[in-house]
Amino acid sequence: MWGFPEKGVLGLRTAGEMGFQGAEISLGSFEEHYPMSDENVQREYREISRECGITLTALSVEHLNQYGLSHPMNSRRGKIALEGSRIGLETAARMDIPVVQLPSFNSGAIRTEEDFENTCEKIALLCEEAEQYGIIVASENTLSVEDTLRMFGKIGCKNFRLMFDSQNYFLDHGADTAQVLRELYPYVEQIHLKDGYNGQISSALLGRGETHFLQTARVIRETACARWLLLENYYDRPPLNQLCADPLELVRTDMKTIKTVFEMQ
């Protein structure tokens, strides 16, 4: 919901009125003491999601983009990364959210072998802890196919999966996203859908950017690899919110594209 024009439970209610069936929410930042970990906030989200008929599909531990899993376990950032992720697991368990997403971007990007080892070490621990809750731990990253398979082999947990993204691989290193998905689809749990151009994240409506979204969508259809398809275009900020006076119209446009591409009624 972080790119949706309306925020919080108001955004959840609006999404329900627009016809969305599910939504991924965020744990919130370390600096704000992880707002979604507050039981009153959790109760409000659960009540609204039930009223609107929206499934809470995943909880993103977004602070990992500032305090990454790639940092050593005994470093300040590494400790914050692990602590916040554990709070994410507890929060998801209380809210009956089946997936906790662990992003590896910005400060948490996996660029070196040490980054890789540090990230795998923490994810393996979190997967073991998530088993008691019946929760899936999903990594979102831009590793190569080879390194992604190596990560799955090293972590070796049945509840470890991949949160795929339709733009990030192309944005990070110009990869053929459709081909990456063809090779990794057995490991995919959910998929973020966004597009862009000129090397800018989420800067185009679906199918109008340079990431060959329609080719990726074709692979999604052929493999039926994801339990959920989640809109992740940033409708609430430039450049997308400059395209229309009402950003919700942009959301409706992408919804129409998805229904057409995936032949949804």
Regions found by a protein language model. Give the residues of each.
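Active-site-proximal loop/turn and secondary-structure-junction residues that shape catalytic pockets
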Residues: 3, 27-29, 62-65, 104-108, ...
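Charged helix-capping and loop-helix junction motifs
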Residues: 37-43, 78, 82-85, 113-123, ...
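A generic structural signal for short
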Residues: 1, 33-34, 76-77, 114-115, ...
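N-terminal pre-domain/capping segments
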Residues: 1-93, 149, 157, 186, ...
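Histidine-acidic metal/acid-base catalytic patches
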Residues: 5-19, 148-160, 164, 170-265
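Active-site acidic/histidine proton-transfer and metal-coordination neighborhood
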Residues: 8-11, 50-52, 66-161, 171, ...
